[in-house]
From Swiss-Prot:
The lineage of its organism: Bacteria, Bacillati, Bacillota, Bacilli, Bacillales. Monomer. One of its GO terms (molecular function) is translation initiation factor activity. One of its GO terms (biological process) is ribosome disassembly. IF-3 binds to the 30S ribosomal subunit and shifts the equilibrium between 70S ribosomes and their 50S and 30S subunits in favor of the free subunits, thus enhancing the availability of 30S subunits on which protein synthesis initiation begins. GO terms for cellular component: cytosol; membrane. Keywords: Cytoplasm, Initiation factor, Protein biosynthesis. SUPFAM superfamilies: Translation initiation factor IF3, C-terminal domain, Translation initiation factor IF3, N-terminal domain. PROSITE patterns: IF3. Disulfide bonds: none annotated. This is Translation initiation factor IF-3. Its main location: cytoplasm. It is found in: Cytoplasm. The keyword Methyltransferase does not apply.
Amino acid sequence: MSKDMNVNEKIRAREVRLIDSNGDQLGVKSRQEALDIATTRNLDLVLVAPNAKPPVCRIMDYGKYRFEQQKKEKEARKKQKVINVKEVRFTPGIGDHDFETKLKNARKFLEKGDKVKAAVRFRGRAITHKELGREVLDRFAEEVKDLGTIETKPKMEGRNMFMMVAPINEKN
């Protein structure tokens, strides 16, 4: 919502197309005539389309209108879901128990609606065995396929191989 809407005397146009509070068009009127109509109804004259020829003004209760707009904005902010990206790190030769523990954490993240970045970190000479890292990520993808979908396939970036998994309910 624009904070600086022109209301009543702040409207500079000489002629305006007037719409009443019910949405009915009252035609093209002079600014003063439109202001007089608004004041007799104890309402405000609000410029809603300044770029139209002639500009469009509406007769309404401006305070109530601003309150409604603020309420709508607040509701829209509440409905926005912030999606976090959680990272789970593996090594190419990870043990079964360690893998299960990290898998359990990743499943929790996906259930909460967060994206999961699964990364395999290669240290030292392990970088020569990239296929081991791919096997770990493939196994991870297989284990979480009921909760998430693969957003990016496994790829190398520096000494890390990673993939992104998004929760399934986000796609629907």
